[in-house]
Structure formats: structure tokens, C-alpha cells
UniProtKB/Swiss-Prot annotation:
SUPFAM superfamilies: S-adenosyl-L-methionine-dependent methyltransferases (SSF53335). This is Probable methyltransferase ltbC. Belongs to the class I-like SAM-binding methyltransferase superfamily. Monomer. Gene3D superfamilies: Vaccinia Virus protein VP39 (3.40.50.150). It comes from Aspergillus luteorubrus. GO terms for molecular function: methyltransferase activity. Keywords: Methyltransferase, Transferase. Residues 1-22 are annotated as: Disordered. Probable methyltransferase; part of the gene cluster that mediates the biosynthesis of luteodienoside A, a glycosylated polyketide consisting of an unusual 1-O-beta-D-glucopyranosyl-myo-inositol (glucinol) ester of 3-hydroxy-2,2,4-trimethylocta-4,6-dienoic acid. The HR-PKS ltbA produces the trimethylated polyketide chain from acetyl-CoA, malonyl-CoA and S-adenosylmethionine (SAM), and the ltbA cAT domain then uses glucinol produced by the glycosyltransferase ltbB as an offloading substrate to release luteodienoside A. One of its GO terms (biological process) is methylation. It holds the Pfam family Methyltransf_25.
Length: 285
């Protein structure tokens, strides 16, 4: 399913550095809050699966079920298929996995009440509230079976330490401006509003069918800091989608340059570190 500009707000693009970051994610790190609820026979959909490292990880938990991963990028799906092939996972039958092009905002090609579990990580946070994420949540709920689980993870806070490096403003703040398309009236990104959005999408928040929790990611050490700085440099090069989105949001070339200098200095600072807080949502249809 092809995507259009109106239904694709993903700002980071699929540069090699970006995809390498996504490939570090695993089911055990990004979906630990969901794993205890997966049954061996479950039919699972992973929305915005990227290079498929989380999706592939679901197969051992749904070893007698089936798993599908969808993404808007045909290129990154090629990596996902390669990951499944490398793990010798079949494409049909019990314990199988397939990857398909799809855009949640353009509607999914699956009938109502199809999946036991729908998972979506680090995707809704790129959708300015309320309309885009609400549309996505409503569509994911549609394809869930009655009693099925929708699980989402999105980042609600990011911090770079020491704070004196000012990367909370330069990196996190500029990223926020890009997602919100420079709208000065926008209140915040989508993740802090997830409980309210789940309620509006039709989940019974007052009946004990919506659970909210948090998780975290920490990056530290010289090698990891340099890796993050290299990613920032790659993403802010001319022609990269992230740089383009920053410019479209009104972020200047001087501000981009300042961000890159701060990122480099942070990477070279002994004992500097990064922490992210994630909103983990579980909801039963």
C-alpha cells in the first residue's frame, strides 16, 4: 500500500544510521510489558515494524500462531524479510511471519476482528495529536478480535546529561517542532495524551480494560555516545528527511549547526549519558 504525503508524518526517514538504531530493538526490550499476555496460537500484527527485529522476536512467543509486520517503506521491509530468512522462520503455517507494505493512516487491508494482538512501537509519537493518532488507534482497534490486545510504546520524555550541553532544547526541542510542523499553538506531541486517545478510540478506560505503564531506555559509555552523535550527523546532512523536516518547521541552518556541535561535544564528554521515558499502553477490546 503506497503512502501519500498527507498520511506519512514519519520524520526520521530510513538512512542507514536510522535503520541501524531501529535494528537494536528487540521484543524483550520494547514489548516486555506485552510478552506475558502472548499465547502460543496468537495472530499478531506489528504496525510500523521497520527492519523487523521486534516482529521476528514475537514468533518464539506465538510459536503456533502467525505474525505480520507492516511498514510504509518497501526498502526497510527488505531488511525485515532478510532478518526473518536469517532466523529460518517460515512464511506460512504455524510459527510463520510475513512482511507487507501498509499505511495505518490509509486503512489496513485486513477484515474487522482479525488479530489477537496488534503492536505498535515508536510510531504514534510522529503523529501530531489528536486526529492522526486517533485515526491510527481506531483502525488498529477495528482489526482486533473481541478480547484482543492493542499494545503501544511511544517516548514521552528524552533527556541528555549534563543538561548544560543544552541538547534537550537543541535535539529534543527541534525534533518536537518538526513533528508539530512548527505550529506554535500545538500543545504537545501525542504520547502524553495516549490514555485519552485510547478512550476516544473506543477502549473502556473506566472498566479496567486500559493499562498504563512506563519503560525506559538509557544510553551511556563513549562508544554509544559516539554512535548517537554519528546518527545525528547523518540525519542532519543535506537531503536527509529529518533535516528537511527541521527546515520546513522553521529551524534555521545556524540552529542545525549548533545542534551538531553540541552533539559532538556531548559525545566527547566523559560520563555524559541519555535517558528516555516511554509510555507503554495495553488495552483490551
Amino acid at each position: 500500500m503506497a503512502s501519500t504525503g498527507q498520511t506519512n508524518n514519519y520524520k526520521q526517514g530510513y538512512s542507514s544510521q536510522t535503520v541501524e538504531t531501529q535494528q537494536t530493538r528487540r521484543a524483550e526490550s520494547e514489548a516486555a510489558f506485552l510478552l506475558p499476555y502472548i499465547k502460543k496460537t496468537d495472530y499478531i500484527l506489528d504496525v510500523g515494524c521497520g527492519p523487523g527485529t521486534i516482529t521476528v522476536g514475537f514468533v518464539k512467543y506465538a510459536s503456533e500462531g502467525r505474525t505480520i509486520g507492516i511498514d510504509i517503506s518497501a526498502n526497510v521491509l527488505g531488511r525485515a524479510k532478510a532478518a526473518a530468512d536469517e532466523a529460518s522462520i517460515p512464511k506460512e503455517g504455524p510459527g510463520s511471519i510475513i512482511f507487507e507494505e501498509g499505511n495505518i493512516l490509509e486503512g489496513l487491508a485486513y477484515p474487522d476482528n482479525t488479530f489477537d494482538i496488534v503492536f505498535c512501537a515508536h510510531t504514534l509519537g510522529y503523529m501530531p495529536p489528536p486526529d492522526m493518532p486517533l485515526k491510527a488507534l481506531t483502525e488498529m482497534r477495528r482489526v482486533l478480535k473481541p478480547g484482543g490486545i492493542l499494545a503501544t510504546r511511544d517516548t514521552i520524555e528524552q533527556h541528555f546529561y549534563p543538561r548544560s550541553m543544552d541538547l534537550d532544547r537543541l535535539w529534543v526541542g527541534h525534533f518536537r517542532r518538526a513533528v508539530l510542523k512548527g505550529d506554535p499553538e500545538a500543545e504537545d506531541l501525542s504520547p502524553p495524551f495516549m490514555p485519552a486517545l485510547f478512550r476516544r478510540a473506543g477502549f473502556d478506560a473506566d472498566g479496567g480494560k486500559v493499562h498504563i505503564s512506563t519503560g525506559s531506555t538509557v544510553f551511556s559509555g563513549a562508544t554509544t555516545r559516539q554512535w548517537l552523535a554519528n546518527r545525528a550527523e547523518s540525519q542532519l546532512q543535506p537531503g536527509d528527511p529529518l533535516r528537511r523536516s527541521w527546515l520546513e518547521a522553521g529551524i534555521t541552518e545556524d540552529e542545525i549547526h549548533e545542534t551538531l556541535l553540541a552533539s559532538k561535544k556531548w559525545a566527547e564528554t566523559e560520563d555524559a549519558w541519555y535517558a528516555a521515558l516511554h509510555c507503554d499502553m495495553l488495552a483490551w477490546k
